[in-house]
């Protein structure tokens, strides 16, 4: 198949209207990996065919039909991307950065990356340096120090191409002859002035430009906020130069802390007005101007991320027990290995149940996912296809 035709399908799938990232990723797993279909084969089907084979909602069927009818327009965009030297990296590609999947999981990993530059930078250890657009002198000095320190350690610096900290991180990295990834808050085809400005480092393989949004999408506040998760997701280390108590940097750090990420925040000077100390209270690690961990006088707060209290009464999860045998556990252990029909489960576990009883149990169990088809198959709800999220 012509390469840009295949990429056309990926553009269509990645930007289905109002589909969440998780829903899109589960759709990709369902079609590509569970059903072993190509996108060409899938879109050969009509609405009736999709309805017979898959458990799509009416809205999803309409969205897929719209995407199918939109293919001619998307094909022109795919061809333009190819002709202008852009690359499209789908989530099932070996070029897709493993660290992004590890950090964002199936829920938030973008289905497609649009890039320009040396794609090998996506596989190198990376450091994110983030902060306010209106950062003070100390924050910019910190950014400069951490960027140049990262270059000496042969790490890629990831930033978001906003004013303030982002721009300082990029400029300091280039000045030190380092490598950088720019994560855009817009479609990659709308960044023409940036490509002209950074033409030389891009061509030399020192700068890679990346977007996850529709190629022709203009800059947007919502996209800028969404982009922050990808900056954090691409990095193994995250440094915060300066944060307000709201906005993109703050939201990104809070999200990172909830994901149990280690986040390093510059310890502010006494008269500075920012939310850096509050982030330390919430569990971030305080660092000095050189990015080295320092003892903090602020005690971490336990409000946001406190585990369930020992005194809290929790209703135990129900299990199906047959004599001394925990059948539910046996079924879940089997489903850890892959997908099975009701008949295959009965045979593998030698259960003294009829098919209807087992099917009812499987459909009602919150840990089990139903894969539509004839016959239906079952797997663990939290089981992620190793070829996508290994």
Question: Where in this protein do the model-derived segments appear?
Answer:
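Short, small/acidic-rich helices and loops at N termini and domain boundaries
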Residues: 1-93
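Glycine-biased, small-residue-rich flexible motifs in mid-sequence functional cores and linkers
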Residues: 1-10, 17-18, 45, 91-390
């Amino acid at each position: 198949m012509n390469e840009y035709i295949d990429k056309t399908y990926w553009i269509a799938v990645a930007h289905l209207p109002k589909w969440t990232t998780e829903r899109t990723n589960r759709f990709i797993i369902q079609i590509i990996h569970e059903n072993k279909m190509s996108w060409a084969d899938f879109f050969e089907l009509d609405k009736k065919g999709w309805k017979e084979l898959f458990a799509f909602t009416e809205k999803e069927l309409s969205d897929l039909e719209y995407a199918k009818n939109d293919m001619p327009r998307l094909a022109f965009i795919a061809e333009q991307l190819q002709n202008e030297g852009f690359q499209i990296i789908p989530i099932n590609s070996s070029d897709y950065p493993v660290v992004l999947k590890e950090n964002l999981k199936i829920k938030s990993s973008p289905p497609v990356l649009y890039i320009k530059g040396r794609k090998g930078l996506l596989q190198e250890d990376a450091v994110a340096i983030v902060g306010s657009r209106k950062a003070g002198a100390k924050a910019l000095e910190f950014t400069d120090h951490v960027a140049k320190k990262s270059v000496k350690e042969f790490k890629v610096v990831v930033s978001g191409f906003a004013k303030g900290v982002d721009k300082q991180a990029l400029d300091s990295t280039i000045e030190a002859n380092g490598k950088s990834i720019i994560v855009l808050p817009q479609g990659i085809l709308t960044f023409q002035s940036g490509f002209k400005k950074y033409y030389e480092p891009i061509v030399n393989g020192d700068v890679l430009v990346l977007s996850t949004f529709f190629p022709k999408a203009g800059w947007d506040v919502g996209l800028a906020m969404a982009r922050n998760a990808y900056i954090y997701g691409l990095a193994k280390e995250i440094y915060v130069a300066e944060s307000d108590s709201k906005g993109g940097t703050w939201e990104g750090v809070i999200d990172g802390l909830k994901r149990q990420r280690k986040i390093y925040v510059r310890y502010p000077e006494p008269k500075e007005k920012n939310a850096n100390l509050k982030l330390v209270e919430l569990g971030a690690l305080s660092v000095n101007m050189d990015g080295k961990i320092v003892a903090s006088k602020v005690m971490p707060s336990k409000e946001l991320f406190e585990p369930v209290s020992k005194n809290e009464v929790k209703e135990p999860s129900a299990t199906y027990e047959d004599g001394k045998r925990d059948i539910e556990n046996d079924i879940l252990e089997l489903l850890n290995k892959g997908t099975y029909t009701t008949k295959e489960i009965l045979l593998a576990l030698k259960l003294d149940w009829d098919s209807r009883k087992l099917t009812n149990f499987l459909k009602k169990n919150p840990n089990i996912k139903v894969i539509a088809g004839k016959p239906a198959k079952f797997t663990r709800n939290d089981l992620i296809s190793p070829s996508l999220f290994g």
